[in-house]
UniProtKB/Swiss-Prot annotation:
<keyword id="KW-0698">rRNA processing</keyword>
<dbReference type="InterPro" id="IPR003742">
    <property type="entry name" value="RlmH-like"/>
</dbReference>
<keyword id="KW-0489">Methyltransferase</keyword>
<keyword id="KW-0963">Cytoplasm</keyword>
<dbReference type="Pfam" id="PF02590">
    <property type="entry name" value="SPOUT_MTase"/>
</dbReference>
<feature type="binding site">
    <location>
        <position position="108"/>
    </location>
    <ligand>
        <name>S-adenosyl-L-methionine</name>
    </ligand>
</feature>
<dbReference type="GO" id="GO:0070038">
    <property type="term" value="F:rRNA (pseudouridine-N3-)-methyltransferase activity"/>
</dbReference>
<dbReference type="InterPro" id="IPR029028">
    <property type="entry name" value="Alpha/beta_knot_MTases"/>
</dbReference>
<comment type="similarity">
    <text>Belongs to the RNA methyltransferase RlmH family.</text>
</comment>
<dbReference type="InterPro" id="IPR029026">
    <property type="entry name" value="tRNA_m1G_MTases_N"/>
</dbReference>
<keyword id="KW-0808">Transferase</keyword>
<protein>
    <recommendedName>
        <fullName>Ribosomal RNA large subunit methyltransferase H</fullName>
        <ecNumber>2.1.1.177</ecNumber>
    </recommendedName>
</protein>
<keyword id="KW-0949">S-adenosyl-L-methionine</keyword>
<comment type="function">
    <text>Specifically methylates the pseudouridine at position 1915 (m3Psi1915) in 23S rRNA.</text>
</comment>
<comment type="subunit">
    <text>Homodimer.</text>
</comment>
<feature type="binding site">
    <location>
        <position position="76"/>
    </location>
    <ligand>
        <name>S-adenosyl-L-methionine</name>
    </ligand>
</feature>
<dbReference type="GO" id="GO:0005737">
    <property type="term" value="C:cytoplasm"/>
</dbReference>
Amino acid sequence: MQISIITVGKLKEKYLREGIDEYSKRLSAYCKLQVIEVNDEKAPEEMSAAEMEQVKRKEGERILAQIKQDQYVIALAIDGQMWSSEKLSAEMDKLALHGRSQVAFVIGGSLGLADQVLKRADALLSFSKMTFPHQLVRLVLLEQVYRAFRISRGEPYHK
């Protein structure tokens, strides 16, 4: 399976980079992983609703340019469905069974995802109703994808 993580912005924090590197290494035994970082838009603290939409639209265009036609797209969105680790594993197994071996997970910037990205998504996934920094979500996502592969193969994992 080929997993792409398409995310807005560069990772700056060393502790997150170390965690992401660790899970990327672990995932190499299960899939081909690609992390694609698209540039984020400069966004001042105070913005109008129209300015926020413009930032999301520009970031969204960059995201959409990275999505391949045949990829199954799972967008991380606060209004998405909340899945257990077992459900994520089952969904990934189902995709593989149906020949959908290219999966893209999309993580938006600090303002979230543009409507055009949400419309392109085949599924919307939420980790929580809480808001998390998008850089931290990248680490949590990689851990959950790793856990999903372990569950699928009947290998031990922490519950």
